[in-house]
């Protein structure tokens, strides 16, 4: 999923739903589509695809009658460029062996496109979704094929931890295969500068603060941080706070937070913000804070620990940061010039808890070709093709760790597959209005940490409206 388009994607998804439920007319539809950023022609095409507000039909989602014979798979996804090339490499042996054609359609607004196609009775055979929340919605509507109706579940349970199976299930059935994952329990550093400074990677939060203080006391800046990301500014801080919350409170409380079963004014949420503030607040940790944090792009901030001389020593963000580093510093050697250490333990009850994300494979039609492709994509051998090419972390425990192209990628995959507790990033699972408010709240907190109570009260007002609407 392209992180930078999450806001537009969700807005279009809501617009399509509102139109189909006759909450808005054609004129309002066009006005909102243009406001989101669509061109007039694109908005007109989307309106036409909605079919004048046709309601969702029940789709081909049952497996009781057996699969329909087919030799093609229409697959809707978000992969372009190197990701598309790698997926083509994965499917090449499958196509050759099974004589099945895969028609892959790429879209930047997958949720809106898929919703529109379903409403127009033109659903693809399969789709790669951005998060399990959308999968749960489609499963509840009866739009998806239960994968456990044809997968070897004994093998699946051997390959995937129960946490991944739970995330992919609805009402006791498996509807989603988690495929290309992201590990957000990673703090990035330069081993050479750590060695030169006599620094040890910390394993607990108190150790992390002690290390940060030690670096700051030497007249250097221990951290880099950038929260700027155009309309989505603030999401890196939301990732920080989600990881902190899970590490402090565990999965059960995290789930309550995401579902708004506890208010945003709950002390546990305030504590998570304040813990994040131990890093973000105060000019002694981050050069130019707080303004530099707010104005610096998240990718630009990732470079600072790896400059010569270093402009910082640590940077937090998901394992996709490796791509930022190697893209900027072409000669950087994984494990030598850059590495990560696992997010440190805050509460010993939840050691090893990590947040992350993953692309979600779902089936919308029950055909022999779909069943064959899903079975193939679920195998470790198929996933290892992409793993070896780089840029792919698999939650499949049976994928050979030796297949990863370098020690850093291997370590991230190992951390992900062996995580004692795993949860998707909290903001990705929240209603759009709450997600947007969360991002904004993190920016306000960095700017004015003394206003935290007011910020959380405002968050609670937004959540109270969004979860009941």
Labelled PLM ranges:
Residues 93-160, 167-169, 192-203, 304-306, ...:
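Extracytoplasmic "Venus flytrap"/periplasmic binding protein-like
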Residues 195, 414-469:
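Conserved C-terminal helix/tail region of periplasmic/extracytoplasmic solute-binding proteins
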Residues 92, 96-97, 317-321, 327-392:
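Extracytoplasmic/periplasmic substrate-recognition and gating elements
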Residues 1-28, 40-45:
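N-terminal secretory signal peptides
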């Amino acid at each position: 999923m392209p992180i930078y388009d999450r806001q537009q994607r969700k807005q279009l998804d809501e617009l399509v739903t509102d139109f189909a439920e006759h909450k808005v007319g054609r004129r309002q539809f066009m006005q909102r589509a243009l406001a989101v950023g669509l061109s007039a022609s694109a908005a007109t095409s989307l309106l036409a695809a909605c079919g004048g507000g046709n309601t969702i039909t029940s789709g081909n989602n049952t497996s009781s009658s057996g699969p329909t014979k087919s030799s093609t798979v229409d697959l809707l996804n978000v992969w372009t460029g190197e990701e598309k090339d790698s997926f083509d490499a994965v499917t090449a042996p499958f196509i050759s062996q099974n004589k099945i054609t895969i028609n892959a359609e790429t879209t930047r607004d997958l949720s809106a496109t898929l919703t529109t196609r379903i409403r127009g009775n033109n659903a693809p055979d399969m789709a790669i979704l951005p998060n399990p929340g959308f999968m749960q919605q489609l499963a509840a509507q009866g739009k998806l094929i239960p994968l456990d109706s044809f997968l070897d579940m004994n093998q699946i349970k051997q390959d995937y931890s129960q946490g991944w199976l739970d995330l992919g299930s609805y009402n006791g059935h498996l509807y989603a295969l988690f495929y290309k994952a992201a590990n957000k329990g990673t703090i990035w550093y330069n081993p050479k500068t750590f060695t030169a400074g006599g620094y040890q990677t910390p394993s607990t939060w108190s150790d992390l603060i002690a290390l940060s203080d030690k670096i700051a006391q030497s007249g250097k800046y221990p951290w880099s941080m950038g929260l700027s990301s155009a309309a989505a500014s603030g999401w890196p801080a939301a990732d920080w706070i989600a990881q902190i919350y899970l590490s402090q409170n565990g999965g059960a409380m995290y789930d309550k937070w995401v579902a708004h079963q506890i208010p945003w004014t709950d002390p546990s949420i305030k504590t998570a913000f304040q813990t994040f503030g131990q890093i973000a607040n105060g000019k002694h940790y981050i050069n130019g804070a707080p303004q530099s944090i707010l104005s610096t792009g998240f990718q630009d901030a990732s470079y600072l620990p790896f400059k010569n001389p270093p402009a910082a020593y640590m940077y937090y963000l998901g394992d996709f940061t490796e791509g930022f580093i190697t893209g900027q510093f072409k000669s950087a050697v994984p494990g030598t010039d850059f590495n990560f250490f696992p997010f440190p333990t805050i509460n010993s009850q939840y050691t090893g808890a990590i947040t992350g994300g993953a692309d979600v494979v779902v089936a919308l039609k029950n055909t022999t070709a779909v069943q064959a492709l899903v079975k193939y994509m679920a195998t470790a051998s198929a996933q290892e093709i992409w793993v070896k090419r780089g840029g792919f972390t698999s939650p499949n425990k049976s994928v050979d760790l030796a297949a990863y192209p370098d020690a850093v990628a291997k370590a991230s995959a190992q951390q992900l597959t062996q995580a004692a507790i795993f949860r998707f990033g909290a903001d990705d699972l929240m209603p759009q209005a709450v997600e947007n408010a969360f991002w904004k709240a993190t920016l306000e907190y960095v700017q004015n940490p003394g206003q935290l109570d007011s910020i959380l009260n405002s968050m609670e007002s937004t959540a109270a409206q969004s979860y009941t609407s």
